[in-house]
């Protein structure tokens, strides 16, 4: 049997923030505050790998509590993640927001996640994410959005596509009081599907 590329299936949303006085030269966040943020989010014993921003059509959101219970020590945790780091005295924030996409016949195509990393408030993060969504949709040829994107509402493009941003919105922030601080928001996958390849027959060599 020949299998197609695996498709991310069940996932949960989480966020975390952390601070530390420790930090090696060149990696001042990864060795302390980022690890503290992973612990705050409940995924500190995973090997975290980042995806880009596409959510499969069949992906299923599960409660965070259920997702955390299924984690095994040392497993690969694949995430769509936004992260912000800062030093003592700074304010840092991160956010992830999903967007459902429907075609002109109202067929659900799948979704996208948009990431924000910076020092903005929740409202500023939403504004930035709305701008990012507009560009993402236009680059893919789904049409233009004449007015500003409305979060938590349906938005129709010039080609009839329907976008609904904000079904999932995760935001976290931190006023850094120690030497280093990190904050992140993420969608974390805990299972995958393996579809059969359409071209399952192998061609014989001549």
Model-derived regions: residue spans:
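Helix-coil modules at protein/domain termini and other flexible surface or pore-lining loops
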Residues: 1-206
């Amino acid at each position: 049997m020949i299998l197609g590329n695996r498709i991310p299936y069940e996932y949960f949303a989480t966020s975390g923030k952390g601070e530390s006085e420790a930090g090696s030269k060149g990696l001042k966040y990864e060795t302390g505050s980022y690890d503290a943020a992973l612990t705050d989010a409940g995924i500190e014993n995973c090997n975290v790998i980042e995806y880009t921003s596409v959510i499969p059509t069949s992906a299923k959101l599960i409660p965070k509590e259920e997702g955390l219970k299924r984690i095994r020590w040392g497993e690969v945790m694949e995430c769509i993640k936004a992260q912000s780091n800062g030093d003592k005295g700074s304010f840092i924030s991160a956010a992830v927001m999903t967007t459902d996409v429907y075609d002109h016949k109202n067929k659900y195509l799948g979704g996208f996640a948009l990431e924000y990393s910076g020092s903005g408030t929740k409202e500023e993060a939403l504004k930035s994410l709305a701008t990012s969504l507009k560009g993402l949709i236009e680059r893919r040829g789904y049409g233009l959005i004449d007015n500003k994107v409305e979060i938590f509402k349906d938005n129709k493009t010039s080609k009839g596509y329907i976008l609904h941003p904000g079904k999932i919105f995760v935001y976290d922030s931190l006023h850094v009081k120690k030497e280093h601080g990190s904050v992140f928001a993420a969608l974390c996958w805990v299972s995958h599907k393996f579809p059969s390849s359409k071209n399952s027959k192998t061609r014989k060599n001549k």
